Amino acid sequence: MRCPFCGNVDTQVKDSRPAEDHVAIRRRRFCPACAGRFTTYERVQLRDLVVIKSNGKREDFDRTKLERSIRMALQKRPIEPERVDQMISGMVRRLESLGETDVQSKVIGEIVMERLAAIDTVAYVRFASVYKNFQATGDFEDFLSELRPPAPTTDT
């Protein structure tokens, strides 16, 4: 593995252990050339997925991009990093198990929305505001009104 600090190709594995509920291997690496230390993760990839964007453009599925958007929605929320890793791994497995190599970006967005709604409402609303392209406060109000149960009516 190439060192991200100096580019040396001869790095050493100092520690390996299961991660993400045994669906990945976390490796701690050391570069003898610059003494840099870094971590890598090894995961099983069942198939190469291609994302079809709403404008028709196709691009390779990027787990890191998915992870970044989810972590941004969960920023400063009381969710353990391990739970986030498990959630992301579960979403990737679900996408791979669809049986298709081409996946609409809308499908990915809906899966993320579903998972975030189950673990944190604030993160769900944050993600929805970007995913559904909210433009004004009214967009938030409309979305939040769909989340809230209707107020009980009083019969007098």
Swiss-Prot record:
This is Transcriptional repressor NrdR. Its cofactor is Zn(2+). It comes from Jannaschia sp. (strain CCS1). HAMAP family: NrdR (MF_00440). The gene is nrdR. The keyword Nucleotide-binding applies. The keyword Calcium does not apply. A zinc finger (unnamed) spans 3-34. Belongs to the NrdR family. It comes from the Bacteria. Negatively regulates transcription of bacterial ribonucleotide reductase nrd genes and operons by binding to NrdR-boxes. Binds 1 zinc ion.
